[in-house]
Amino acid sequence: MSLQRAGDGADVQAGADQIGDLFYPLYLRLFDEDGDFVGDVDTKLSEARMADNVEMYISRSLGIGVIAGLLLWLVGLMLGYALFVLVGMNVSVGLPVSPGMADLIETLKIPLLVFVMGLVFGSIGFGIGFGTLIAIPYSRASARGREINMLLSDAVSFMYALSVGGLNQLEILEAMAQADDTYGEVANEFQSIVQETKYFDTDYRTAIRNQAMQTPSDELAQFLTDMLSIINSGGDMTGFLDEKKRKHMRTAKQQQEMTLETLELFGEMYMTLSLFPLLLVIILVIMGIMGNSTDTMLLGTIYGLTPLLGVGFLVMVSTVKQDDPGDGYLNPSDASDRLSQNTDSGLMNLGLVESFTGEYAVFDRVKDREGTHTTLDIMKAPHVFFRDNPTYTLAVTVPVALVILVVAIADGAVPIRWQGLCEAKSALDASTVSCGSDQARVTEEGSKIVVEQGMMHQPVWGTFMYVYMPLYVIVVPLAIFREWNVRSRRRITNNLSENLRKLSSANDTGQTLLDATRTVSDTSSGKIADEFETMYAKVNYGMSLKEALIEFNNKYHIPRLARTVKLISKAQEASSQITDVLSTAAQSSENQDDIERERKSRTMMQVVIIIMTFLTLLAVMAILKTQFLNVMAGLTDQASGGGGGGGGAGGASFNASVNVDRLSLLFFHAVTMQAILSGLIAGYMRSGKLASGLKYVVVLATISLVTWMMVG
């Protein structure tokens, strides 16, 4: 299968190269190879670490743009022909012209309109195709720059720890290049420096200078430039890194402040964006009462515009808000087989025994016994397993939700039609028709004889079974176990800074790092103290301290913890007295605590704004349903029952144009979608993860359900 995938990728790349070769002459005609645009794209390709050369990339972009433009040009021609020829849409400018000129304009009008529509659609297609490909390196370079800026403070602290440990400049660069499991894109930038010196016979000063010009991060470029000055002048590298470490800690706080200010602006924008569909729905309902048919626009607003605005807002927030980079796992290249296997172990991988199966039967039996033991452990404490693996709840809850829904549909307990079935006026063709059909039989009181109820007749129950039941069965367990998982892992980082200070103080008294962990575990309480005690026991039984630290980190796989463990484990390899390194780790952790505390306090207001905006929308929808639609329907029924001419005419007009049950269903669906979107947005703005919004989704959706049970 891997060979097949590789072949498919090669075919795609070959096709892209053919498009680039085909449109290369057009590139030469349109663009100057020494121009600003070509140079800018070349720079972004380098910053994004994309292997394409600028000539072929722009040529390929032109080809994709031309193909997309031709396709949309054909769509525009067909749409124009359908509108102006088949439908006969009349377009008149109203210019005063002579009769002869009017005849000429009338003759050329339709061909010109069709041509112009095709031209407009073709231009849009070319812009989308060409612009999208050109935007890719800009987007990737920007994302890399943001990640580098986020990790630079910790990366400089890591380099400082290496310098304190006695490593020279080249060794620091090489160690930084190998730390890609922790420092991500920052390590990739240093990999470029090391590889240039290793494979291209370039001295490392020139390589640093070149990378300073190619990196997408201005902060890293300035750091490399200043570092080069220290190297050239023979200055104190340790003092330089200590100064830069403090500077970038302050810079990290300033960047967090800018991000929070932008999120506050987005929170204010959300109020306007989310209320726009509500205002449009109100206008469309009023237009419907006045006799104008707006079914398509109403459906498009509720089922199209509302989710589109929510998803668009999420995308907009994602451009400025980024989660802590990395997955939190440490995978050193010199790790033992036991550590590597335990890191990859899980439900489908039993760890070290996997590497011995297949050669000897005894290991196959060990694997079977290990699998049985693991299964029994899960069955004895399934809540612990789901706490550590929240997404595995989907393997249980999704089938349960499907079974409940299928059984309910099979028993006829859930409506399966939108409008239901009613008795037909004439049973020649069929005894029942859709309740929305004109052929449905009407009683003397003006009501239709319903044979099978649809979603409009049971808006709350039908929506509950199709939306809320899966929501509660699937999302509630996932949200509970995920929140439990987050809180259990957070217990490690809550006291991390304090315990690092204790480690530093103990190490300063002359204790080794191992003895310091024992001292801290004896004098502290909480989860991290228990982990220190476990770590001490592992080392006493023969494990190296580095591997014990890595196992401790991989158990919780928190990116922030991974950077701290990487810092300490690398420093303790050089010396057992690492007081300065531990103090640096504690200072970096305290800086992260301050940033996290500020983020929580500032984003809480944005969450409140989002929730209050949703509650306002829900209240307006409920009032519109109870105080307007229900009252109008009641007045219509009274007028019809009284038999008055004017009242009867008004009632017939209202009944013909507005279906109260249908509008109630649409309003309920609108507030339900808004609840789901508002919950996801609130969670994403709060912590940078969509999954953290699940608890808000459940709460807001429940409020919507209870409200509509009372008003619907």
What do the predicted segments below correspond to?
Residues M1-D52, S92, Y303-V384, T391, ...:
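Membrane-cytosol interface segments
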Residues S2-I19, V38-R49, T206-D226, F240-M258, ...:
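Hydrophobic alpha-helical transmembrane segments
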Residues L79-F115, R205-T215, I286-L298, A413-T463, ...:
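Membrane-interfacial helix-loop-helix connectors in multipass membrane proteins
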Residues M709-G712:
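Juxtamembrane boundary at the C-terminal end of a transmembrane helix
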